[in-house]
């Protein structure tokens, strides 16, 4: 447990380092903290903070910098919340409101990623709204012996095709009968609802219809998952100009791999979508994106009161967390508003 003197010095050190990007020495702390302490006393407190793992001393400087643990304590206990005033506290957000108007979902999330990147000067990320896979219309077409083309049409007109191999050959008439039966009894239901009904109804279905139905459900589920694994990334090139990364090609390479492959990023944003409000990961806290020099500020967004995706900012641990929280929070609200309007 830190006393008030240590808290003040840690808060001052973090704020100065975020602002200047340079290790903070005892003389700077003495001036900036407003505490009337001798240099020796400040050095003793700094030594205690370093022993607690809250600050560290770079080899090239006598000053100190915050560690991920120090940033976490700062964010959790010392951060002063800024007012959510788009016009006065963050003028760029007023312009963002003009960009994030009701539109096609893909355009909204693309604009949102750009807004996050432009305002933060870091990387903006937005996951596409999750869609519940729904059976609308299905057709089976014979391609050859034991080969069937499955054509799945979504409620919004998207068409997905897949070739499946069946246990026996089916005539065109059988395939038409199967598709007519499925469309008549299951159209309009979610993939999950169809899956649950099949558990109880499969014994009553004719063998060929049951097998084709199972293949259709599997295909529909995979198609829906594929649509939901979309993330828009904007501003990756901003990392090239940050002193925190620009001189470390190894870290840059790992970061660009993260943005290109997107699998880890999707997992992290999926976890974030289960939290209410803004969530902050500092350094390797998430264990999904284990970069000690990286922080993620994220928040879920909704459509008609239901969480359907996540957005956020990715940048160095040396970021102005109060400002990033505000940018992410308001952008989340604007996206929610844009997607919820009919």
UniProtKB/Swiss-Prot annotation:
Keywords, alphabetical: Repressor, Stress response, Transcription, Transcription regulation
InterPro entries named in the record: GAF-like_dom_sf, HrcA, HrcA_C, WH-like_DNA-bd_sf, WH_DNA-bd_sf, WHTH_HrcA_DNA-bd, WHTH_transcript_rep_HrcA_IDD
GO BP annotations, alphabetical order: negative regulation of DNA-templated transcription
Keyword Oxidoreductase: no
Keyword Ligase attached: no
GO molecular function annotations of the record: DNA binding
Job of this protein: Negative regulator of class I heat shock genes (grpE-dnaK-dnaJ and groELS operons). Prevents heat-shock induction of these operons.
Similarity remark: Belongs to the HrcA family.
Listed name of the protein: Heat-inducible transcription repressor HrcA
Species for this entry: Methylibium petroleiphilum (strain ATCC BAA-1232 / LMG 22953 / PM1)
